[in-house]
Amino acid sequence: MVVLYQKIMKRNKDFTMDGENEDLFFLSNGHISPVFYSVLARSGYFPISELQTFRKINSRLQGHPTTHEGLPGVRIASGSLGQGFSVAIGAAISKKLNKENSIVYSLHGDGELQEGQNWEGIMYAAANKIDNLVCTIDNNNKQIDGDLKDVLDMGNLEEKFDAFGWKVLSLEKGNDIEEVEKVLNEAKNLCFNEKPIVIIMNTEMGNGVDFMMGTHKWHGVAPNDEQLEKALNQNPETIKDY
């Protein structure tokens, strides 16, 4: 998300819900809202100080993003897993009907691909050549109940999307922000060639923090003060250039 908002997407100065003549981003796995809100604030959509209200009573920053409070940068209520593909595809179709040279981006968790609605949209997008669409899969093999392969193994995602007719890009170093920028630029340059694009981004949950790496147990758990200090010391600022 950092790379998309700071380096890739064409964005208008003022936020509007319809996003006319600009690129759009939709977050499907809405439970990663802290990351989304942080990026939006640092991209000028609302004051950074508002991040301190996260999940508090009457805050605009709830656990799952919602349009109810009119938070700039949020266009859909997300977190009902599996709906993001359908929303992004619909927005991409709208851009094409309006003859805009704009791209729709979306982010999805690998676990939510277990929802059948995804695959109806994936099939539709390829069959109808929705080629102004770039979808990224956060492929970390973790979901709330455990490892993806143990809960419901999705097999080889590259082969699946290829079979459905998508242009498939793979990134092994999904935690390397420079590599992320390269693959997103590659995807952007491949748009408008009669195929939707998917990036299978292999990542590690909790990367850089020794007690959070490689486990699903931090999926919905907040660190205490001691754990927070330790995590911040192990994982210092890495995006200052963005």
Name each region found by the language model.
Residues 24, 103, 132, 196-198:
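Beta-sheet entry/capping signal
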Residues 43, 151, 213-217:
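Short secondary-structure boundary/capping segments
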Residues 177, 181-242:
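Glycine/aspartate-rich loop-and-adjacent alpha/beta segment that forms the canonical ThDP
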